[in-house]
Curated annotation (Swiss-Prot):
The N-terminus is blocked. May form homomeric filament after self-association or heteromeric filament after association with alpha-tectorin. Exclusively expressed in the inner ear, where it is found in basilar papilla, clear cells, supporting cells, cuboidal cells and the lagena macula. This is Beta-tectorin. It is found in: Cell membrane; Secreted, Extracellular space, Extracellular matrix. Zona pellucida domain may enable to form filaments. Keywords: Cell membrane, Disulfide bond, Extracellular matrix, Glycoprotein, GPI-anchor, Lipoprotein, Membrane, Secreted, Signal. Residues 305-329 form a propeptide. Residues 19-287 form the ZP domain. It comes from Gallus gallus (Chicken). Gene3D superfamilies: Zona pellucida, ZP-C domain (2.60.40.4100), Zona pellucida, ZP-N domain (2.60.40.3210).
Length: 329
């Protein structure tokens, strides 16, 4: 009985309570996460209660949060009402997502000034991932606050035990000399992004240095396709993971270097606006053979000269990605 009485008193207090104190601060805080967008405005803007404000004019999902009204777009993919009227467009190489918080009172007369808090989140589509990877595990996921977001922190390169790409090899990844020519399975994966975004590998190459622009390099993937027939691209642009395999190799005539660094230009593709899967014409892929030994062209941009090195240690094709370095003994 006491509990019921207290509950009724709370209801009556709310019923007779006056409107909130108007706040005329034109401020909006925007947090652009890889999958979610959160916005905050000062509570009681120009006298409006939180239940009178709608995200995109659709979602009345505002909550009180320490002096602010907070609104959330839980997923950047338009499904049901979770998208909350968010609009998007692609202006190469940036994705733009924009929406607004608007007043939407259904009463006969309105005494508060209408409000419209517009906001935008932008995300780059292209990333060059080239960190040393064999001594580093999956990249730590973090986000950047503000009006500009990034997908880069969600990208990582993993090594797998076989072509099923189900079992990840632990770092550090070491290739023994006796394993030169053996299959290596790799995948660039994006975690925590909306399902609408697919991972596309544009170009992948290997260098004997951590510098992605090092003059000695070997191409693995060019314009989304395998550089030769010994490299197999399993998936590219179909899911949140792009996978491929190649034969382990080492660079010749490179003294005092035992590491191979991998680099990939990675594109995050919006499958709701574009066709993301990469289609390759195998007739355009060429492989040179001399006496059954593969010949690889390595550009050595030294004084404008270009030289060729012969890799006689078995199939010499590697080059993968996004900053993981294989230690070859």
């Amino acid at each position: 009985m006491v509990a019921v009485t207290v509950y009724l008193m709370v209801i009556l207090a709310q019923a007779f309570a006056g409107p909130c104190t108007p706040n005329k601060a034109d401020v909006i805080l925007v947090y652009c996460y890889p999958r979610t967008i959160i916005t905050k405005i000062p509570e009681c803007p120009y006298g409006w209660e939180v239940n009178q404000l709608a995200l995109g004019g659709i979602c009345y999902n505002g909550i009180h949060d320490s002096g602010y009204y907070q609104f959330t777009i839980p997923d950047l993919s338009p499904k049901n009402k979770s998208y909350c009227g968010t609009q998007s467009e692609f202006k190469n190489p940036v994705y733009h997502f924009y929406n607004s918080i608007v007043s939407n009172d259904s009463t006969v007369i309105v005494k508060s000034q209408p409000v419209n808090y517009s906001f935008t989140c932008t995300y780059n589509a292209n990333y060059l991932v080239n960190q040393a990877a064999f001594d580093q595990r999956v990249a730590t996921i973090h986000v950047k606050n503000g009006s500009s977001g990034s997908f880069e922190s969600q990208l990582s390169l993993n090594f797998y035990s076989n072509a099923k790409f189900s079992s990840i090899k632990e770092a550090p990844f070491v290739v023994e000399t006796s394993e030169i020519g053996s299959d290596i399975f790799a995948g660039v994966e994006a975690k925590g992004l909306s399902d609408r975004f697919k991972v596309v590998l544009n170009n992948c190459w290997a260098t004997p240095s951590s510098e992605y622009f090092y003059q000695v390099h070997w191409p693995l993937i060019t314009k989304g396709c395998a550089s030769d027939f010994s490299i197999v691209v399993h998936e590219n642009g179909k899911t949140n993971r792009a996978t491929f395999q190649f034969n382990a190799f080492r660079f010749q005539n490179i003294p005092k270097l035992s590491k191979v660094w991998l680099h990939c230009e990675t594109h995050v593709c919006d499958s709701e606006k574009f066709s993301c899967p990469v289609t390759c014409d195998k007739r355009k892929q060429r492989m040179e053979q001399t006496g059954g030994v593969l010949v690889a062209e390595i550009s050595v941009r030294n004084k404008g000269l270009s030289r060729f090195y012969m890799l006689s240690d078995v199939i010499f094709h590697l080059l993968f990605a996004i900053g993981f370095c294989a230690i070859l003994l």
